[in-house]
Amino acid sequence: MKFGASLIRSMLASFSLTGLMVFGVTAQPLPKPQGPVLLTVSGKIGQRNVGDSAQFDAAMLDALPLSKITTTSPSRDKASTYSGPSLKSILERVNAQGSRFRLKAADRYEIDIPAEDITLFNPVIARRLDGHEMKIRDRGPLLLMYPFDSYPKLQNNIYYARAVWQLQHIVVE
């Protein structure tokens, strides 16, 4: 059976109406982490490498396409460059299927990120700050960063609260 453009558009429209976001279909299996695990993704995902989750070490995160955001933030006086994989690329790698993403930090902070944030603002899961690996004192080793300077509507406490530092876990719901 041939899939025509109209069928694909129809499928995409139905996903949009239900609020469900489907992030990629990756045929290549996700390898197991060889180093310390920096990020775990669980929930509605199609790719797993450890039990019911997808775990990433530094090398696995670095193998994903690099994204950069240069922006100011409430925690820094000057514009800084945050680099690492985009949240979207991680969700694509694990074949995430959900409309809401719960981010959990090392200090037990949790916040939900709507799918619209990912498509509209393309936040980055930064491993590097101004070219240097982020340490715990830099709010690392992982920090979800939004392009605050590129979108003035992000410059408020709602979005500042979504910039999760010491990110460890994403639950796809």
Where are these regions (language model features)?
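Bacterial N-terminal signal peptides that target proteins for export
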Residues: 2-15
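Sec/Tat signal peptide C-region and signal peptidase I cleavage site
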Residues: 23-27
